Regions:
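Charge-dense, low-complexity intrinsically disordered regions
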Residues: 165-185
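A surface-exposed partner-binding patch
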Residues: 1-108, 117, 177-182
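Low-complexity, glycine/alanine/valine/leucine- and proline-rich hydrophobic stretches
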Residues: 113-117, 128
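Compact, glycine/acidic-enriched structural inserts
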Residues: 129-155
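Short, Lys/Arg-enriched alpha-helical microdomains
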Residues: 213-230
Length: 230
């Protein structure tokens, strides 16, 4: 059984779920490099959605701005550049070797490590909260990483311990236009100053909320933070 078949067992796509069709040639032309075959199969199998109620993959031409691969490549790369300019802690990898591929509810990022830009099937995975400086490396492709995460077989320092108690699952995002528009309004507001989990935690404590140093930020706390800053 290959990794994709195992992932479909652990996190089955909903019955009748049909992801959007992708023009891979145009996507790769826009990014300037080829993409891994396993990622293409993931996108064609799942489309936009949530793995283990925590992690989402960026998608080509995604109607959700926060998940659009090209848009997030630009935005996250800009964050990497700013981080290099102001941080006392250097990045463990040059930005040119990091291709954003996903994010989490807590503001963590998933990257491909492009050790050879022309051989994408050999790319491995790096995960970071960026602001806290913690980086984790997974020596396998994206699908294998999702399998390991779903089986609790990999340790990612940026991820909350509560994820180990989370059942494997995949939940597709709604295609309702009004929900997409609402999400994009919030995404566009946040683009200029991307929210980091430590900023939310600090604000929450200053305003009387009880939040752990690590772990999933409660939904009511995140909503209160967003309401106070938008």
């Amino acid at each position: 059984m290959n990794d994709l078949e195992r992932l479909k067992e652990l996190c089955p796509p909903p019955p009748g779920h049909t992801p959007p069709t992708v023009n891979w040639h145009d996507t790769e032309q826009a990014l300037g490099h080829p993409l891994p075959d396993d990622y293409k199969h993931l996108v064609e199998t799942y489309g936009p959605g949530h793995f283990v109620q925590f992690l989402s993959l960026y998608q080509p031409k995604c109607p959700y701005h926060a998940l659009d691969l090209e848009r997030q490549t630009r935005d996250v790369n800009a964050q990497l550049t700013r981080h290099q300019e102001v941080s006392q802690q250097p990045l463990p990898h040059p930005p040119r070797e990091l291709q954003p591929v996903g994010g989490t509810d807590n503001g963590d990022y998933l990257f491909w490590l492009k050790n050879d830009p022309e051989q994408p099937n050999g790319w491995t995975i790096a995960v970071t909260g960026l602001k806290d400086g913690d980086w984790s490396h997974f020596d396998g492709n994206l699908t294998a990483f999702l399998v390991a995460l779903s089986q609790h077989d990999t340790d990612v320092s940026a991820f909350p311990d509560s994820l180990l108690r989370q059942s494997p699952s995949f939940t597709p995002y709604t295609t309702a236009p009004e929900e997409i528009e609402k999400a994009n309004r919030h995404s566009n507001t946040a683009t200029a100053a991307p929210v980091q989990s430590q900023d939310v935690r600090q604000w929450a404590r200053e305003n009387g909320y009880d939040v752990p140093e690590r772990g999933r930020i409660p939904a009511d706390v995140r909503k209160a933070y967003d309401a106070a800053h938008n």
